[in-house]
UniProtKB/Swiss-Prot annotation:
The presence of a 'disulfide through disulfide knot' structurally defines this protein as a knottin. It comes from the Eukaryota. Disulfide bonds join C54-C67, C61-C72, C66-C79. This is U3-theraphotoxin-Hhn1n. GO terms for molecular function: ion channel inhibitor activity; potassium channel regulator activity; toxin activity. Keywords: Disulfide bond, Ion channel impairing toxin, Knottin, Potassium channel impairing toxin, Secreted, Signal, Toxin, Voltage-gated potassium channel impairing toxin. Belongs to the neurotoxin 10 (Hwtx-1) family. 51 (Hntx-8) subfamily. Hntx-8 sub-subfamily. Residues 25-52 form a propeptide. SUPFAM superfamilies: omega toxin-like. The lineage of its organism: Eukaryota, Metazoa, Ecdysozoa, Arthropoda, Chelicerata. Its main location: secreted. Expressed by the venom gland. Weakly inhibits Kv11.1/KCNH2/ERG1, Kv1.2/KCNA2, Kv1.3/KCNA3, and Kv2.1/KCNB1.
Length: 87
């Protein structure tokens, strides 16, 4: 049973490696690893840290006001989404 699991895992890993090698050889750009990693771990603009006058989601709202669409939680002092029980 263990040998069958190991052979299936090695077969699957080999197929994945074969796919990556074939895709890399067909790609004309030399920046393939960097491009592949950046597409896998793409960061949306909403998640980037930016300097602004208001506090975003789950940020402290003691000194800054929350951005539009968020309210300051009276219990935790974080900016959170408004909900009926938080009004």
């Amino acid at each position: 049973m263990v040998n069958m699991k190991a052979s299936m895992f090695l077969t699957f890993a080999g197929l994945v490696l074969l796919f990556v090698v074939c895709y890399a050889s067909e790609s004309e750009e030399k920046e393939f690893p960097k491009e592949m990693l950046s597409s896998i771990f793409a960061v949306d603009n909403d998640f980037k840290q930016e300097e602004r006058n208001c506090a975003g989601y789950m940020r402290e709202c003691k000194e800054k006001l929350c951005c539009s669409g968020y309210v300051c939680s009276s219990r935790w002092k974080w900016c959170v989404l408004p909900a009926p029980w938080r009004r």
